[in-house]
């Protein structure tokens, strides 16, 4: 049976970076956390902000943890199922604590903007797109806001996966899109089916993506 139709786009968690800064400083996209921190040290030495953080919008503070899930799953494949079943805990799983430790690493190395507690999500996008900052841990949906608010700088922004300690383990944390569903008790099932059919079609997907 068909229970639902995907609606929207998949989303990834990783790190936005300024391509111009990377080019000017001769940096390469890091494949390990050590490489990332070495890049940050060079950025800081150049006088730029290495990692933008924007805790005025508190949800942005979790990105180092969220984006590290690919690495957590690679190290402990059963963690999500065990965590859901209350058989595993973050504090007792070293691989799960890595994301929190990454945030501490960046803070303790003095790599953040001084106003990280007051800066907003849009401040972070501005900083990484205009070259005030080299990196901004973020979700890929930020492309829409960058396109809207900083279109002239959009091409200067790249995106890479949050590195692990092993270059052989390197990938994006991905969220699949939500779905549209029709209740069996709906009094307008036929109308709803027509809408869902359109939403799941190529024209419907194109319309939704272009408006996002």
What role is predicted for each listed range?
Residues 31-38, 115-129:
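Short helix-initiation/N-cap motifs at beta->coil->alpha
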Residues 121, 138-143, 176-178:
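Beta->alpha turn/N-cap motifs
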Residues 1-31, 37, 57-84, 174-182:
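Periplasmic solute-binding protein
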Residues 46-50, 129-138, 155:
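Alpha-to-beta junction loops
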Residues 24-29, 104-118, 132, 149-157:
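A local structural motif
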Residues 24, 109, 148-211:
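Extracytoplasmic/periplasmic substrate-recognition and gating elements
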Residues 40-42, 84-116:
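Glycine-centered hinge/linker elements that transmit conformational signals in sensory
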Residues 72-98, 148-152, 161-171:
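Short, solvent-exposed loop/beta-turn-alpha elements that line the ligand-binding surface or hinge
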């Amino acid at each position: 049976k068909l229970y639902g139709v995907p609606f929207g786009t998949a989303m990834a968690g990783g790190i936005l970076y300024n391509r111009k800064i990377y080019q000017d400083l001769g940096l390469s996209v890091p494949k390990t956390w050590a490489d990332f921190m070495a890049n940050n040290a060079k950025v800081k030495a150049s006088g730029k902000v290495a990692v933008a953080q924007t805790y005025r919008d508190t949800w942005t503070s979790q990105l180092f943890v969220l984006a590290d899930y690919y690495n957590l799953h690679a190290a402990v494949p059963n963690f999500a199922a065990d965590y859901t079943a209350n058989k595993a805990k973050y504090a007792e799983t070293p691989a799960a604590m890595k994301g929190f430790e990454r945030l501490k690493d960046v803070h303790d190395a003095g790599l953040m903007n001084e106003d990280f507690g007051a800066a907003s999500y849009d401040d972070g996008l501005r900083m990484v797109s205009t070259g005030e900052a080299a990196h901004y841990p973020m979700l890929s949906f930020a492309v829409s806001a960058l396109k809207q608010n900083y279109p002239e700088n959009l091409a200067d922004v790249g995106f890479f996966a949050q590195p692990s300690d092993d270059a052989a383990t390197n990938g994006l944390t991905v969220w699949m899109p939500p779905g549209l569903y029709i209740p069996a008790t709906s009094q307008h099932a036929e109308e709803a089916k027509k809408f869902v059919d359109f939403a799941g079609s190529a024209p419907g997907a194109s319309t939704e993506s272009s408006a996002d």
